[in-house]
Amino acid sequence: MFGVVPKVIWEKTNPADDLNMIDMAARSLLIETTNKLILIDAGLGDKQNEKFFSHYYKWGGDSIENSIKKAGFKSSDITDVFFTHLHFDHCGGAIIRRGERLIPRFENADFWVNKDHWEWATSPKSRGRA
């Protein structure tokens, strides 16, 4: 998580557990206008397999879908989803698994991302593929 920063430095503010894991939060933003319901980032999601989640604790009972419901809306009410960037913890919640199929969670939404980041994500250089 902290790259080349030594653990003795980052663990002062982010203590790790016995598995060297730290608490982190992903926050999304829901914006209601007169004719739009815009979601900024969709979070991690839950379509990943057990091996994936062995590296990430999912704590707390909320999901992006539950949070939208608590605000009085349904996933189908979302008109636009804007991704700040295309890392899995920001866009993973936009897709759900139905059996072997992956389908959009927000079926009525247009999806938006910065052009430069889209190009980076869809045409990675050799270092970015690693």
What is each PLM-predicted segment?
Residues 21, 102-104:
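A general structural signal for short secondary-structure junctions and capping/turn motifs
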Residues 44, 88, 117:
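Short, glycine/acidic-enriched loop or turn micro-motifs at the edges of active sites
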Residues 38-40, 82, 111:
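Residue-level marker for buried hydrophobic side chains located in beta-strands
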Residues 59-73, 77-89, 105-130:
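Metallo-beta-lactamase
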Residues 49-50, 92-94, 123:
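Short glycine-/acidic-enriched loop or helix-start segments at secondary-structure transitions
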